[in-house]
Amino acid sequence: MEEILMHEIKESDWKILRELLTVALERFCRQILSEIKQIDADSAKSFHQKYLDIFRLVQRRDREIARVFNNPSRSTALIQLAEMQSQGLLSADEYLRFSQGTRNIIAHLLGTETAGGK
């Protein structure tokens, strides 16, 4: 795995990733806001409990946002792309824009390789 992480993303894939960062961040924030709405809609909980649940959720999700989106660089791009893919932040068409080599690395990182490496 270390040898994979030492590789930088291809220039063409880096350009695609930079294009998709804003879209993926918007999707992630939409997911988080949806989770907040679900917590708020729970009439069985007190307002204070809802507040505490939302606070914890935002803290946890903020760490995830930082891991996936903060300080994008070519040296961390493969990990960030793997995180985006694992969070379901890219559509199938968006993901297929990346080279087969990059998709193979992401599949390896996520443990989703199939027979034949595809």
Please place each PLM-identified region on the residue numbering.
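Acidic, Ser/Pro/Thr-rich low-complexity regulatory regions
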Residues: 2-118
